[in-house]
């Protein structure tokens, strides 16, 4: 029965995204919600200017409807499900405001860094407040073992850091057609397996709902992309995957399963540090996916390579937790 629920969930998430996209994409185009391309980015990206953005709305809609329908039919809204939906919708709303300012108000930078950071922290603090209210464990466990450590009040700092950092890391990965959609689908699929292994079936249902929604979106986001998810989608996905890691006590394993997001972020950090300290850049451009573009790789080759890396890291993460 539960296996059928999981199958129905991913199919439903996929179909909602696929069927909604042909309606929603022309609507975004009529509103002239087109992506502006930075001049300092790769020149090959300039032809993408005007491609409809804010497609993350479709992903979030699919996730929300699919999750609520499946949970109401086969279970009930648990505290875990509430937290997952809250983070997804909260970070999605923050991303929506950022995108709206960019495309509707023609302010290419969107929200200021300070405004976005404050929003991310506020959502993370509310998440932890609810988390604490329901007395979820403040322990952190070493993957593949029963060894855990209670961080006490320090867990609050970890949660806020993970949600803010994780949402930004996923956001940085959304730079090529289909790159984030593919890597996210893989990562959420891995967490679905691990949540299922822990008998956290509501978290598993949510995870496959996200995977299905993102795969449906990928049909229209793969190269050449007909729509971008924007910060609306990337921040929502980032917050969601971190929340899943926290609720399944797989915070450490997130670094492996989400390894592509981690490496992308580290490439930006190292680039900034190197330039400020030595005046030289380590990469031709950061995040890392742009570096490979500028050394001559085709966009599709970069994307498939990163998908492959994400898949291998996901398999490694599952192996460590389940079979090691």
From Swiss-Prot:
PROSITE patterns linked to this entry: MRAY_1, MRAY_2
Cofactor: Mg(2+)
GO cellular component: plasma membrane
Gene Ontology MF annotations: metal ion binding; phospho-N-acetylmuramoyl-pentapeptide-transferase activity; UDP-N-acetylmuramoyl-L-alanyl-D-glutamyl-meso-2,6-diaminopimelyl-D-alanyl-D-alanine:undecaprenyl-phosphate transferase activity
Pathway(s) of this molecule: Cell wall biogenesis; peptidoglycan biosynthesis
Membrane-topology annotation of the record: Multi-pass membrane protein
Membrane-traversing stretches: 5-25, 51-71, 77-97, 117-137, 147-167, 176-196, 203-223, 227-248, 302-322
Localization annotation: Cell membrane
InterPro entries registered for this protein in UniProt: Glycosyl_transferase_4, PNAcMuramoyl-5peptid_Trfase, PNAcMuramoyl-5peptid_Trfase_CS
Key word rRNA processing present: no
Alphabetized UniProt keyword annotations: Cell cycle, Cell division, Cell membrane, Cell shape, Cell wall biogenesis/degradation, Magnesium, Membrane, Metal-binding, Peptidoglycan synthesis, Transferase, Transmembrane, Transmembrane helix
Reactions it catalyzes: UDP-N-acetyl-alpha-D-muramoyl-L-alanyl-gamma-D-glutamyl-meso-2,6-diaminopimeloyl-D-alanyl-D-alanine + di-trans,octa-cis-undecaprenyl phosphate = di-trans,octa-cis-undecaprenyl diphospho-N-acetyl-alpha-D-muramoyl-L-alanyl-D-glutamyl-meso-2,6-diaminopimeloyl-D-alanyl-D-alanine + UMP
GO BP, one annotated term: cell division
Family the entry assigns: Belongs to the glycosyltransferase 4 family. MraY subfamily.
Purpose of the protein: Catalyzes the initial step of the lipid cycle reactions in the biosynthesis of the cell wall peptidoglycan: transfers peptidoglycan precursor phospho-MurNAc-pentapeptide from UDP-MurNAc-pentapeptide onto the lipid carrier undecaprenyl phosphate, yielding undecaprenyl-pyrophosphoryl-MurNAc-pentapeptide, known as lipid I.
Protein name: Phospho-N-acetylmuramoyl-pentapeptide-transferase
Annotated source species: Bacillus pumilus (strain SAFR-032)
Lineage start: Bacteria, Bacillati, Bacillota, Bacilli, Bacillales
């Amino acid at each position: 029965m539960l296996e059928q629920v999981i199958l129905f969930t991913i199919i439903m998430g996929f179909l909602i995204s696929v069927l909604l996209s042909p309606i929603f994409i022309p609507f975004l185009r009529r509103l002239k919600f087109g992506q502006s391309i930075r001049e300092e980015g790769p020149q090959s990206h300039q032809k993408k200017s005007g491609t409809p953005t804010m497609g993350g709305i479709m992903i979030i809609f699919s996730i929300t409807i699919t999750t609520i329908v499946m949970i109401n039919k086969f279970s009930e809204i648990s505290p875990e499900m509430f937290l997952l939906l809250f983070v997804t919708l909260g970070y999605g709303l923050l991303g929506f405001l950022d995108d709206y300012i960019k495309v509707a108000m023609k302010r290419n930078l969107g929200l200021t860094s300070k405004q976005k950071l404050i929003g991310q922290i506020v959502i993370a603090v509310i998440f932890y407040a609810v988390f604490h209210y329901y007395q979820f464990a403040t322990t952190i466990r070493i993957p593949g073992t029963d060894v855990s450590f209670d961080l006490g009040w320090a867990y609050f700092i970890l949660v806020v850091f993970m949600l803010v950092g994780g949402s930004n890391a996923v956001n940085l990965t959304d730079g090529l057609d289909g790159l984030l959609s593919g890597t996210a689908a893989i990562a959420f699929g891995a967490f679905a397996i691990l949540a299922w292994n822990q008998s956290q079936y509501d978290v598993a249902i949510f995870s496959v709902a996200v995977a299905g929604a993102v795969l449906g979106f990928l049909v229209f986001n793969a190269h050449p992309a007909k729509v971008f998810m924007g910060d609306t989608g990337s921040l929502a996905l980032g917050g969601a995957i971190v929340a899943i890691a926290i609720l399944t006590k797989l915070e450490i394993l997130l670094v492996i399963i989400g390894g592509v997001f981690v490496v992308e972020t580290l490439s930006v950090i190292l680039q900034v540090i190197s330039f400020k300290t030595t005046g030289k850049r380590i990469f031709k451009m950061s995040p890392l996916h742009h570096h490979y573009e500028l050394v001559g790789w085709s966009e599709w080759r970069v994307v498939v390579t990163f998908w492959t890396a994400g898949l291998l890291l996901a398999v490694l993460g599952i192996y460590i937790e389940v079979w090691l």
